[in-house]
Amino acid sequence: FAEESIYMAAYSLYKDSPNFNLDQTGTLSAINELQSYLNNYPDSKYREDCTIMIKDLRKKLEKKAYEKAKLYYKTSPFNIASLKSAVIEITNFQRDFPDSDYNEEMAYFKVVSQYDLAKSTVEYKQKERFEEVLKFYLEFIDKYPQSTYLKTAEKWYTDSQNEVTRIAKIEAEYKALQEKEKSNTSKIATSPQ
């Protein structure tokens, strides 16, 4: 009797779980209760039902996280904070839902968001951020070599390579100029007057 009561309480939380676009506190509670039930009654006749419900609830959390990351991606062209947030949310999504059907799209969005961030950022941070684009692109093609997004992602990769090369050249020229000035300064300081 107690087992059935606990199952029914967990089941009612499952039924009460809100749509993905709403706060998911109830969904998390339902998952916890269903998992607790399975842990306490591993041989229950409701085992399969609980497993199916947990998968269904996790799909809801996945959809919520996907839509959140996608929203940051869509709003990201408007400001640098949104670009950073898009990359962070996409990274969190990939970590939390490694087997998601949305991961190919998310990996592409991550490349684009990081590229836009690198282009929009202050000069002294650009090289590092373009190098991140290169890293994200390589992760993308490693996982999705046949992706429909491949051609577009290649453009961001090539542009990023060119930017890293351009910035490295500027840095080398600046360093050479500093060395030359330092050398000239020391010659002036050591020359007899």
Describe each region flagged by the PLM.
Residues 1-193:
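Acidic, polar-rich low-complexity tracts and alpha-helical solenoid repeat scaffolds
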